[in-house]
């Protein structure tokens, strides 16, 4: 069972957690106010820690045992505009240190976009025995059969043949998604059949911040390719994340950057998982980038991130306590990611 190996080193694309939305009554330039935009109350100790430049991370409650939700906040000693210039350099910003592979998709997607995609030897080999309800790779049953009919698993070029099929299918996924949106997201038959679009809809429905403070982004993710907000920037990309003791996670995601006119001084950056070959049925990450505007003090920026992963299976308790280990790993990963991002942003901001 894949989920038995989910451990603290897990890193991949992510989620926004559904805490109740709280209306802002605090000073706009405070750490508490930035967190309240996400429905998270910081106590005085946490607020003071953020102002000192420390990263604050919390694990949040979820409605489904398979979901993991993590919240983090940090203050950057750079302006919002300076930080957003870094973020909107998608090719560099999205290619994080944990990623062993990455590429942006052209519009329309072309073969060169996926020329660096390589299916691992283990994944390629295991497809030989895949069947509906029992497969180590997340695929529709029709694609399991296609691979088995087109690949000679006794040949020496199994990995390259499976990789060629995967590259073509990724281009098809992107083209279909651009034309038809969520309705074209894959059906996963590695376990009992489920639609990736249904899992994502469940995650999106719990995103109180995105739905109430940035409803245009929520609606865009729900109705894409319709309803594109004016001024939004978006990109589709693939990534492969290396995870110790786990199979490499190959995924396709849709990222957007948007400054809602109804939320002064804040830009929203969100990422939606379209496909992942292991572990995740759905993932969503929402980051808000807000001005810290305090009279007499240097300009700074609050970055608040909320992530959710919906796993295919995440048992809790017992000797293994898979859920507990996954939660701890994702919490630690959030802290590491935010500390690294703070260091990189402030280093670039001083140039």
Placement of each model-derived feature along the sequence:
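C-terminal segment of classical bacterial N-terminal signal peptides
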Residues: 17-25
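Generic detector of short alpha-helix boundary/capping microenvironments
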Residues: 6, 14-15, 71, 277
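A short alpha-helix/helix-coil micro-patch that ends at or immediately precedes a cysteine
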Residues: 86-89
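Terminal "cap-and-tail" regions of soluble proteins that handle hydrophobic small molecules
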Residues: 27-76, 80-82, 92-93, 97-351
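Bacterial N-terminal signal peptides that target proteins for export
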Residues: 1-12, 21
